[in-house]
């Protein structure tokens, strides 16, 4: 079980730090055959222009190849170890199948070393097992949910995430997501039982700007302190408030303006998510 630790203020940079410490995590290196190099492009495109702002720098990482499909049916796997993954907020687990293959999976809450998991159409309802949504009882809590059968998990993959199955009707089941959104998903899609590990992640505080830079995130500059050539809010004599409703650098209204436009899947969303 992870612990939330508030650090002693031995320096200005440590004063506001709140850390998440999990003593069950593996202390050594990751499993090399399931990792690959990850090149940073710092938000630039092929001609070197910035296409995504506020990216650059940060500690070098290796990508862990995660099994989001969980398609080895009716073959049990034993959890060898739990690991930290720098590429996501949740912990990951290295599992060993009885046929000798190893895979990384998103670690659900409550999973420990030595536990046995399995995927299939009719498996036990326990954390880490995978089955079609049609076979999961109403009220069940799931994560790593597919949107298309056998495409791999796309929903509820971050730390502490989960969805609750609240209805079944025809070829679809209805899920209530943690954001408050209620949507339909094909009943043949698979999901993992339980919620994602490391639910304490939301309590973590980095404590200083440098810790954000270690993660490859650069500062965000306000538009009102820029020049008119750089932002619609820029310019003016002395300090100004921008003089117009908030917009992005490209003139799109922001701070609450809806930009989602996907009519193809709107029919599957019964209630949109709560405002953040």
UniProtKB/Swiss-Prot annotation:
SMART domains tied to this protein: Ribosomal_L2, Ribosomal_L2_C
GO cellular component: large ribosomal subunit
Cited Pfam families: Ribosomal_L2, Ribosomal_L2_C
Gene3D superfamilies per UniProt: 2.30.30.30, Nucleic acid-binding proteins, Ribosomal protein L2, domain 3
GO biological process, one term: cytoplasmic translation
Superkingdom of origin organism: Bacteria
InterPro entries for the chain: NA-bd_OB-fold, Rib_uL2_dom2, Ribosomal_uL2, Ribosomal_uL2_bac/org-type, Ribosomal_uL2_C, Ribosomal_uL2_CS, Ribosomal_uL2_dom3, Ribosomal_uL2_RNA-bd_dom
Region (Disordered): 224-276
Complex and partners: Part of the 50S ribosomal subunit. Forms a bridge to the 30S subunit in the 70S ribosome.
PANTHER family recorded: LARGE RIBOSOMAL SUBUNIT PROTEIN UL2M, RIBOSOMAL PROTEIN L2
The protein's role, per its UniProt record: One of the primary rRNA binding proteins. Required for association of the 30S and 50S subunits to form the 70S ribosome, for tRNA binding and peptide bond formation. It has been suggested to have peptidyltransferase activity; this is somewhat controversial. Makes several contacts with the 16S rRNA in the 70S ribosome.
Family: Belongs to the universal ribosomal protein uL2 family.
Protein name, per record: Large ribosomal subunit protein uL2
Organism: Ruthia magnifica subsp. Calyptogena magnifica
Taxonomic placement: Bacteria, Pseudomonadati, Pseudomonadota, Gammaproteobacteria, Candidatus Pseudothioglobaceae
Encoding gene (name): rplB
């Amino acid at each position: 079980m992870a612990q939330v630790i508030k650090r002693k203020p031995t320096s200005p940079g440590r004063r506001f730090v709140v850390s998440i410490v999990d003593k069950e995590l593996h202390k050594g290196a990751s499993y090399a055959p399931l990792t690959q190099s990850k090149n940073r492009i710092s938000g630039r495109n092929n001609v070197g222009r910035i296409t995504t702002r506020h990216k650059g720098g940060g500690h070098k990482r290796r990508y862990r190849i995660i099994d989001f499909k969980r398609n080895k049916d009716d073959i049990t796997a034993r959890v060898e170890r739990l690991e930290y993954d720098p590429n996501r907020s949740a912990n990951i687990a290295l599992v060993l199948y009885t046929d000798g293959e190893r895979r990384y999976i998103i670690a659900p809450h409550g999973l420990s070393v030595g536990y046995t998991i399995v995927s299939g159409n009719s498996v036990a309802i326990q954390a880490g097992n995978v089955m079609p949504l049609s076979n999961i009882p109403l009220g069940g809590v799931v994560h790593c949910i597919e949107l298309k059968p056998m495409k791999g998990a796309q929903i509820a993959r971050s730390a502490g995430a989960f969805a609750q199955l609240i209805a079944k009707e025809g070829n679809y089941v209805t899920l209530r997501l943690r954001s408050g959104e209620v949507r339909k998903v094909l009943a043949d899609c698979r999901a993992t039982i339980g919620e994602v590990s490391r639910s304490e992640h939301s309590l973590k505080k980095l404590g200083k700007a440098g810790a954000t830079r270690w993660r490859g995130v650069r500062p965000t500059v306000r538009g009102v302190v820029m020049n008119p050539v750089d932002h619609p809010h820029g310019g003016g004599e002395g300090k100004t408030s921008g003089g117009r409703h908030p917009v992005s650098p490209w003139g799109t209204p922001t701070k609450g303006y809806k930009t989602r436009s996907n009519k193809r899947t709107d029919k599957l969303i019964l209630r949109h998510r709560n405002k953040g």
